UniProtKB/Swiss-Prot annotation:
Similarity-based family: Belongs to the GcvT family.
Catalysed reactions, semicolon-separated: N(6)-[(R)-S(8)-aminomethyldihydrolipoyl]-L-lysyl-[protein] + (6S)-5,6,7,8-tetrahydrofolate = N(6)-[(R)-dihydrolipoyl]-L-lysyl-[protein] + (6R)-5,10-methylene-5,6,7,8-tetrahydrofolate + NH4(+)
Name used for this protein in its record: Aminomethyltransferase
Organism: Pectobacterium atrosepticum (strain SCRI 1043 / ATCC BAA-672)
Cellular component GO terms held in the UniProt record: cytosol; glycine cleavage complex
Encoding gene (name): gcvT
Domain of life of the source: Bacteria
Coiled-coil ranges from the UniProt annotation: none
Pfam family, one: GCV_T_C
GO biological process, one term: glycine decarboxylation via glycine cleavage system
Function: The glycine cleavage system catalyzes the degradation of glycine.
Amino acid sequence: MAKQTPLYQQHLADGAKMVDFHGWMMPLHYGSQLDEHHIVRRDAGIFDVSHMTIVDLHGVRTREFLRYLLANDVAKLTQPGKALYTGMLNASGGVIDDLIVYFLTEDYFRLVVNSATREKDLAWIEQHAAAFGVDIRERDELALVAVQGPQAQEKVQGLLKAKGLSDEDVAAVASMKPFFGKQAGDFFVATTGYTGEAGYEIALPNEQVVDFWQQLLAVGVKPCGLGARDTLRLEAGMNLYGQDMDEGISPLAANMGWTIAWQPEDRQFIGREALVHQREKGTEQLVGLVLTEKGVLRNDLSVRFTDSDGVMREGVITSGSFSPTLGVSIALARVPAGIGEQAIVQIRNRELPVRVTKPGFVRAGKAIVQY
């Protein structure tokens, strides 16, 4: 039987269409996925992301452990609260999961990992943590919500003040730069998200989340479901685990090369040797596609192009959808290296030209691609 988040009954009261998402009953939409998408780009929306897994790591060797476990380097995290995005790789360089890690104190780090990968992630972390004496604690007593959009931060700050947080805590939250987290009273507030908009992701006790949700709705924040979350993240060029990358895909072939910390050269993290070989040999690449003609780019459609040697090459769309912000169809596609600015996608029995772009289409409500 599918699990329920602490907000399940609230979703029903809000009119959500519920679906089974990796073993969790989650809202797909609350009437109009399109309206929910636009509200996040123009104002503020709230998502229930309590199905995701929060894992706290404690121990004097926690930083050393994470420098071995993760492809990005937590040595970069010197200011308490600072976070980074990283892949957690297997020995062959495949992506076990992508996650966010927060540095809280020298012996206390926090991970937020995907729901679909929870069991294998925890098993992998526990397997490698033992040698470092790191204590692992899953924080399933915490709910997680994401409030996203150009008005999101202002509305959350006002609510935190109304809930009795000190002026000092509210000011500290308001002054956070992107990719920071801070414990403010019962709330862990982070300037992270999955939409390409400003906002917060907020962890709070399960028993407080319904009240918090209702108070945000009362100040005009709109509930949003998985459907809008997917089109928003696709417009932002953000990967979805299981579609755009998985254990058989290198981060170098998933537009995650920037998350690999190659220096210092003597840091031996899991998967490094395989990545060095892949970098020398060359890999496929993840690109963006824009279709301006009538039609919708869908997952698993083939993408064809002729390389500089006149050879026909083929790739595949990993994520595709209509873009509500741009009014055209967009996609992420994994293709052989050497693709130019144009390619061909076959939709039913029509061959349609697509423009090849960097894998990112919208930021802060504005187009960042030309087509």
